[in-house]
Amino acid sequence: PEGDDSWIDQLKQENIMCDCGNIIKHTAIDVFLNEKIKKSFAPITYARGTFIGMLHKDIVSLLGIQNIENVYFVGKVYDVNKTVSKEYISVVPKFRIYIRGGKESTCSICEKCGVVLYFPLPLNSWYIVDKSIPNLTFFPSALTGIIVNDEILKQIKKSGIKRIGYEKLPVLKEAIDGHNSCFGALPPE
């Protein structure tokens, strides 16, 4: 879904979002789209131009709003007509877990907000570092999407919810990308 340009500009002017796309002020943020809510939107998606997530009511029902509120700040989604969506909620992570990659991964620190800008490469070689995993059934990924345990994955598959991609991520004791120094300098959330 396409985020409204004036809304994105306002988020930047109010120092809620950095030019790099990082959310600086972690709080509930309402999403304003420049289009109507469509059936073609994925059940777990993002307002384009931001890292603000959107969850469809079917995912919300499956995960439970109280569980979602444990790991996300929850807001509303408005369409181009400024009508609140009954289909989607907005979500801003309270914390992030980085999916890691190999030595080809890119890592830098945003000069403006100090966030780690990391992209795991090569594709399809991703993993999670053991010590970064919280004791939760699901939690936000710093890349995109939601990391879930096996039990939640079974529920998602059984639910029949369409248009959800998933991949089993190995859990490694240590990162193999050579970027630990980048992650040692993480700013507080």
Describe the function of each predicted region:
Residues 1-189:
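Phosphate/anion-contacting hairpin/loop surfaces
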